């Protein structure tokens, strides 16, 4: 038994200068797990609650001392003496103790930090890497793959202070044979994109996720800049590198009139028109994945989009599904989208995250492991992607060490596993196998 002897919570700072919760779980034998909760900017309305203090005199109201107090008091008291290797029990104790539907008593940020720290401590006690322990918890011991990176190299929407409506324009280095080679291709395209933007007199300042955030006349202009950068780097768009977008449509959906209002372009679309707008972009560019291509509440729009694009494009639900098995189950039954974005803190525990990944895979949906726009140096999502053989990861661009920490962890894991963790490339993307 790997008995928990101490649980510690503290307030640390994330990549946006906001506080977040870090937790330590100490076991008998001196084993320790350390983990921090990330934080989102464009959030789904049905996400588990991130508890903030609301005290405007501290961190503009964004302090997390209440969540930290929950870790150091109620959660610590409930977990001391328990077996850290029983992850499902540890998570359930915290969920039951919180007692709310959306973890609003303690905060998903408190519960998640402890959940992940516990998994790390248990892995240490077992003498195995975190990815291997996650595979055991997932019921798939020894089954690994290296994920295809979806690298957000132009940021818009809530992730940047510019006029671009679509939140993320991503590249996928599908021509690579290994994860390490994929990162090299991504870095080369990223540096060439800087040259392209500078050549047009555009800003090369970066957004929250490390991508460039220039003012552009249209979303198509962002794709055109990326195409030029790919070619300048010596690669073929559609063969070596494919494209993906996160529309984050809820951010520009007008609930009052049911229109998608893209202020940056001065365009307004009905739900079906917006699907056809995206369809035209897919015809012009090799876009193989679109995330949140409709508002999270527009299930009728999603059903239509899935009918029109679902057989050739991966349609990822983020705000749509919020890593929640109840919502995902309904989506699967109604044929909504064909992929889910996986964010730990949308649901608030490792056990529930693994359940969402399993449900998606069992239904033939893909699962894309994702960071949040507010991150720390915690690289747990790298181990999650490998340990669940998810096949795809979104963890930002080729700048900002809060993003690079995850890529560097993937490099280490690939080196350790060798051919036991194949890099699937484009085969990992729904509709592209």
From Swiss-Prot:
Cofactor binding: number and manner: Binds a second Mg(2+) ion via substrate during catalysis.
UniProt EC number: 4.2.1.11
Root EC class: lyase
Binding site for Mg(2+): 246, 291, 318
Catalytic-site annotation from UniProt: 209, 343
Superkingdom: Bacteria
Subcellular location, record wording: Cytoplasm; Secreted; Cell surface
First and last residue of the signal peptide: none
This protein's pathway: Carbohydrate degradation; glycolysis; pyruvate from D-glyceraldehyde 3-phosphate: step 4/5
Record's catalysed reaction(s): (2R)-2-phosphoglycerate = phosphoenolpyruvate + H2O
GO process annotations (BP): glycolytic process
Purpose: Catalyzes the reversible conversion of 2-phosphoglycerate (2-PG) into phosphoenolpyruvate (PEP). It is essential for the degradation of carbohydrates via glycolysis.
Quaternary data: Component of the RNA degradosome, a multiprotein complex involved in RNA processing and mRNA degradation.
PANTHER family found in the cross-reference section: ENOLASE (PTHR11902:SF1)
This protein's name: Enolase
